[in-house]
Each structure stands twice: as structure tokens, then as C-alpha cells.
Amino acid sequence: MLCSRYFTSSLFLWGEALPTLLEEFLNEVEKMLKNQVNTRRIHQLLKELDDPLLENKDLEEKLQAFLDYVKEIPNLPEARKRYRIQKSLEMIEKLRSWFLIDYLECSGEEVDLSTDIQYAKGVGPNRKKKLKKLGIETLRDLLEFFPRDYEDRRKIFKLNDLLPGEKVTTQGKIVSVETKKFQNMNILTAVLSDGLVHVPLKWFNQDYLQTYLKQLTGKEVFVTGTVKSNAYTGQYEIHNAEVTPKEGEYVRRILPIYRLTSGISQKQMRKIFEENIPSLCCSLKETLPERILEKRKLLGVKDAYYGMHFPKTFYHLEKARERLAYEELFVLQLAFQKIRKEREKHGGIPKKIEGKLAEEFIKSLPFKLTNAQKRAHQEIRNDMISEKPMNRLLQGDVGSGKTVVAQLAILDNYEAGFQTAFMVPTSILAIQHYRRTVESFSKFNIHVALLIGATTPSEKEKIKSGLRNGQIDVVIGTHALIQEDVHFKNLGLVIIDEQHRFGVKQREALMNKGKMVDTLVMSATPIPRSMALAFYGDLDVTVIDEMPPGRKEVQTMLVPMDRVNEVYEFVRQEVMRGGQAFIVYPLIEESDKLNVKSAVEMYEYLSKEVFPEFKLGLMHGRLSQEEKDRVMLEFAEGRYDILVSTTVIEVGIDVPRANVMVIENPERFGLAQLHQLRGRVGRGGQEAYCFLVVGDVGEEAMERLRFFTLNTDGFKIAEYDLKTRGPGEFFGVKQHGLSGFKVADLYRDLKLLEWAREDVQEIDVEGIELPEEIKLIEVG
């Protein structure tokens, strides 16, 4: 047995100690080494150690040597103490690596993983049909069908330590078995005893277990089940327990729990995996370079897959998950690296920029640039004068001043003698950008054109001609810019606004209008770093992380649905003062399934019953783009006092007088969407308000909304949204398939994502064939 003789013995324990596993012991000691070494606590943990791994003599010796090394730390001088703590932490990692992971020993023939699942051990034609319902059709599918959960049966609780509501594993002898028949139910009861305590085990209408349990009478067994308190006697009992002989196969280990389909039980499923997974894992070829495995201390592919199905410890499971998550992210970054390298092959055109126009423009502005804007402009300019084509993502919060930075890039590009193409997702945004740009550049001899779907055929031809002969310096437009018959004389800069509405292919199509053009992508939605690396891994990232001084925050309030009339009255007062309001609903039309309001029905109600004295507009996703643009322009021009809408206005033109945003059923939106909606008001510099009108929602939804009301930083909100809703929901669409990672999680795996981005720089990507599914990053 492990000895605690090296630690002080003047200890006391608070009651009966619960068993401690080796990995828990190492985790606790690691925490102490990073904070303060407590030899009394280590001694207490040693007394509680109960782990089947301790039967390994080699482990016992190495663990004792480790404890010998740690015991002196509190008495050492500071410098030696720091050194020994560092070495102790390294020893913990070695102990984990040696004893907490099962390393596969492979022998025999390799298996073809594309083989039909029918030929797996224990499957056959009948089970093949059942497994197909789960998406398992080949041996590789079986290998990649990871458990949905795990059950830890390593800790053995004493019968007198049981607590109601807990699922536990305990042990003892079956001393009696009997069945009692009632009118609607048969109750099978077996009594488990450790010699001092007796606990009834109960099953309901499961008479078939009686024979099995009688065979185990008088024998030592392990029992796993949920502890209940008897409603009449108060005695603890275990319901629907799984009883295993002491020498059974599912004893003192972590068990995988798989998704099931009708006709196949968890026990049968587990058996199929146990019979096949070792040989399937041994048939895998290593996919990552050896130097990366060593550098990042990652498991080999065989041990990682095995650990996902049959982890020896939770440390083993986490290392397995880490390896496979890293690989998914590595392959994604590899794809982006290939795109980067392909672009760099062609080189860029170093632009000669003196900066005189930009300097003159900055002086003419009625405000000073923030330091973040200056830094962003300098990063973009450095790209433009370099020999590599720029591929940069510019992002910042709502109102952080991205447009001015883009205008400075246009001026630099013009000064160098090149044309600019500025693509946005909607005509109305194109019109807004066009008007702003014309106004901003009125002092300069820059010819700006607008090319959208509504542009007349004759005007289109005139613009196309001007682009071809170089008379037009800047063109602002929608998808019309990537039509085949749009050609440029000397395109040098492509700016794409609201990037997440365009795919990589559309971006590339516009870039291909010129030779070695610089590309600036602008995202209005603040994107967490992990999302930026995953969605825009082929781009460098510039963040405007500073808001202009003096910008007023929008006051945000949660209001219960039964006080919505007070909100309407507030809207009335603000409109009478000259303001305008948005009232947003999650649906276009009323839904029978969801108890939420819709834009159409509420428009009718608000127009007639609540605001008959005001002009109301209606906008939703079913309107054509032309109709949406018309309504939005009319609202911006003041023809409507209130705009009733769905989230189609989350990104739209500025409405300077709009200062009230009312969002009903806000729990139906992501926080990133809500933040964009809130950003629609207060753009004229006046006091602005955002009301979240909430009905009967769960605590989790309320927690999200409370977080939103207390935070105005778009990046914090984006991180929180990613954490709580995932990447697919974050953008409102399942984009790029990134929500389809089997293992990787963009919120928790930022470190792995950064590793992968760094590591692909060391790889020669020439000739590397990417998996078929990774080509999804090119989806337009």
C-alpha cells in the first residue's frame, strides 16, 4: 500500500471520506503546486485514494518517489521552491502519460475501413439494418460513431455513504431475492448487504431478472443504479440497478453510452464496439506529422480513437478529444493555407502611396480618428505597399468607425493609380455607401459609380464602359459586380462589406476581376477570435477595438409582456418629440406552434388600435429586395414614424432620427442579432433606448437576456453567444459546415485552433489532397 509516513500524522477527517481516484488526486496536487502546497491536504487525499490502477506496483513506486520529492517544497528557499514546483508539475504530466492512458498494442492484419458494416463482428444482415438507421454503414462509420456520454463506475461507494438522487456504484453480497405481485405491477426485490448495512434493490415488472439474481445469491457483486428514498419508510433503496459479478466485464471502469435505435440495447451496442474498435483503431494510419505530435504532446491517432470509445480515465478521454479536435481544426487551417499559398504564388503589386490624399481627408473630418482606426489604416496600408496581395478582415463593433477606415484605403488605392470595387449584400446598403462616399470625396477628383440590380440598362452599360476604360475610379454595388461582363481597366482594391453574407467563392470571383488585387473584408458582426480563425482563416485580422469618444450607449431594459402598453406609451412620447421607432418581431405571420407574436398581425393591431395617429411601415423577409429597399428608404426619409419589422433590418441603412428599438419575444433571437438590432438606433447622437419585451421564458433564456442588457461590448456579447448557442446559431445559418465538427468546439478549442494555424505554417501544402468534406469552406 502507498505510504503516508512522510506527511504529518496529526490529521482529522470530516466524517467518512469519499473515495478519490488517482486522476483526481493528481489534479488536486497540481492545483496546490500552482497555489500553495498543503501537505496536510495531500495526506488526507492519500488516505482517500481508492483506484484499481493502484494495483500496479510500478505506479506505486513512481507515485511514492513523486511524493518524496514534493514533501520538502514548503521548507525550501524561494528560488529552489520555484524550481522544484516546476519539476513536480512535469512529473505529474509524466505520471498521467504513463498510467492514465491505455496505449493500444496492435498485431494482426489491418482492416479495410470502407468494408460494409454487415461484416463487422457481431453485426450480420439483421443488425446492419438497425445500425443503418444510426448512419453506420461502414467500419469507418462505426469507428467515428462516438459515445454520446460516459458512465464512471470506478468509484465504489460504501452502503452507509449512499445519498438519494445519486447514481452510484457500490458493492456487497446478494442475501435474498423475492417477487411481490400487485394488481398492476410486479416488484422484484433483492437485498444487498456488506455485513453491516442492508439496502433493497428494486425492479418493476422485470421478472426475467429473478433467475439471474438468484444465481448470484451469496456472491460478491457490484451494483450500479440510482439511490431513492422510500416514500413510506425513508429507507434508501436502489432502483433498476445493473448487477455485475465481482469478476464481470463492466466493473470499475468508464463505460461508453451510445445513441440507440429500436431493436438494439446499450449492452448489445457496447458489445459490438468492444469486439471491433481495437482492430479498427489499429488499422488507422497516422495523419499528423510526428514533429507536431511531439511539439503539442498529442496522442497518436490509434490511441485517440480508442480513447474516445474506451477511455481508461477522463484524462485519457480529454487527450483523445484534444487530438481529434486538433486534427479537424488543422485540416481546416490547411485548406486556408492552400488558398493563401495559391494567392501568394501570383504575388501582389506593391503600390506607391505617399498618403497625401488620406492626410487631407483626415484633416477635413469633423472628428479625430481613434487610435484603433489609425492602427487599422496603417495595417491596411502596409499590406497595400507590400509585394503580397492583401487579404484582410476588418472588424469592429457597431459604430466603431470601419467605414472611415475603408474610405482611407480607397484614397490610398486611388493615389496609387488603381480602381476600387466595393461590394455589399443589399441595394439599400449600396445606395447608402454610395451617397456617403460621394459626399466624403467631394473635394477630390474621384469618379464614384453605383451598380445595383435596379440600375437601368443604359446606365449599366455606361458604368461598365467607364470601368473598362478607367474613367470610373470607384464602383459600389451588390452581386451585380461579379457578373461576367463587368471588367476593370486597373482594379487594385476589393472591399466586401457584411462578409458573412458572401461565400469564399463570391469573394474570389470579385478578386479575379483584377490581377493580384488587395482584398479588404468588413464584418459588421463582432466575431470572436476563434470564429474569425475558423471562418476567415485565409485572412489576416484587424480589429477596431475602441469606440469614438462621446458616443452614447443605448439604454437597454427588460420589460415583462404585461407591461408592453407602457413601452408603447414611451414610443408615442418619443415619436411626438421627433424620434422614430422600430418594433421587431421574430415571425412574419402568426404561428400555431409557437406562442410568439408576428410582424404582420401586430402591424395591423398597432396601426389601428395603438398608434392610429402615426404612420407605420411594415417590412419582412417575404418582401422582394426592391420592396424592402423602398420601405427602408421611406422610413429613413421620415415618411413613417414607426417601422414594424422582422430581423431583416438587423443590418441596414442609418436612420438618424430613430432612437427607440422595441423587440418582442427577444429570446427567439441570438444575442449577436439583438446587438445588431440595438445598433440601429441612436446613430444621430441622441439618447436611444432598447426595450426587450419578454413573455414566459425559462431561466436560461432570461440569464442570456440579462447578460445582454448589462453589456454593450459586441465582442463580449459575441463570445457569450458562441458559448451558449454554438457557431451555426451565431451567424443565424449553418454556414461552412463548421457546426458539423464531430469533435472540435470553437468556443472551448481556441487554443487548439491557434496551434493549428501556427503549425500549418511549417507544412509544405503543395500537393496535399484535402478530405472531400473540407472543400465545404469554398461554398459560396
Swiss-Prot record:
It comes from Thermotoga maritima (strain ATCC 43589 / DSM 3109 / JCM 10099 / NBRC 100826 / MSB8). The gene is recG. PANTHER family: ATP-DEPENDENT DNA HELICASE HOMOLOG RECG, CHLOROPLASTIC. Residues 1-350 are annotated as: Domain 1. GO terms for molecular function: ATP binding; ATP hydrolysis activity; DNA binding; DNA helicase activity. Keywords: ATP-binding, DNA damage, DNA recombination, DNA repair, DNA-binding, Helicase, Hydrolase, Isomerase, Nucleotide-binding. This is ATP-dependent DNA helicase RecG. Its EC number is 5.6.2.4. A motif (DEAH box) lies at residues 497-500. It holds the Pfam family DEAD.
